[in-house]
Each structure stands twice: as structure tokens, then as C-alpha cells.
Design a protein with these regions (language model features):
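The feature marks the mature, well-folded catalytic cores of soluble enzymes
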Residues: 1-131
Length: 131
């Protein structure tokens, strides 16, 4: 890991955010999924990164194995059901999301359409994993 990433992680830690570094999408997936405990209730906000890294796929596999329960706000075409799932996701044990940007000073930049990611980041879930 180069000095720039070490510095960013140090700045995240100063903000009470545990930072991790991964060289590959596979490493990022392994780190992220390791933060989920058996029996956890898991949800997420809209994030292409979760799909590109295979995190959501792995979480669905964990659910099929009976290890976790998922609240999927995007698993329905019904807008009312989707909104209800987003609200319920705020009470999850682990909430996955991605930020729009991360500054070198360890600041997360978030712009959100419905507000569920930003709401989850600031209040609600027991643990938030930003990928």
C-alpha cells in the first residue's frame, strides 16, 4: 500500500471510521463480507460498486445458506414495497453502500436520490460498510 492510501486510512480513523485497503475487487469483497456476522440482518443502498465487486452476489449466497437475512430494496418493481424496504433497511445490522467520493482528508462525499444511503450513514444500522 502506498503512502497516499495509508494517509487516507489514517484520516478515516481520526473520524472514527475504520479504513481498509484492497488491491483488487476480490480483496475488497472478502474484506467487506468478513464484516458480516452469521445471523445479521443486511441491507444496502443503490451502488454499482456492490455489483461490480460481487458483494451483493456473495451476500445473496450467504442468505441462501441461511447465514444472514437480507432486506433488498431493489428486489421488487413495486415502488411502495421498495420504499418500505428502504425504511426497514435503516434498522439492519449491516448496511452496505458506496460514497460518491472520498477525499484525501478522509471525508466522504454523498449525494443521494431518495436519502436512504445518507440516512443509513448517519443514523440507524448498527454497522455501515462503505465500499
Amino acid at each position: 500500500m502506498n503512502r497516499k492510501y495509508e494517509s487516507i486510512i489514517k484520516h478515516l480513523n481520526k473520524r472514527n471510521i475504520q479504513g481498509y485497503y484492497a488491491d483488487t475487487a476480490e480483496e475488497a469483497r472478502e474484506i467487506a463480507v468478513s464484516l458480516v456476522a452469521e445471523g445479521d440482518l443486511v441491507s444496502w443502498g443503490g451502488s454499482q460498486t456492490l455489483d461490480q465487486t460481487g458483494i451483493r452476489k456473495t451476500l445473496f449466497e450467504m442468505e441462501k445458506e441461511g447465514k444472514i437475512t437480507i432486506i433488498d430494496p431493489y428486489g421488487t418493481a413495486d415502488p411502495a414495497e421498495s420504499m418500505e424496504a428502504r425504511r426497514k433497511g435503516l434498522f439492519s445490522d449491516v448496511f452496505f453502500m458506496s460514497s460518491n467520493a472520498l477525499t484525501v482528508d478522509g471525508e466522504l462525499v454523498n449525494i443521494d436520490g431518495t436519502g436512504n444511503r445518507v440516512a443509513a450513514l448517519t443514523f440507524g444500522p448498527k454497522k455501515v460498510v462503505v465500499v
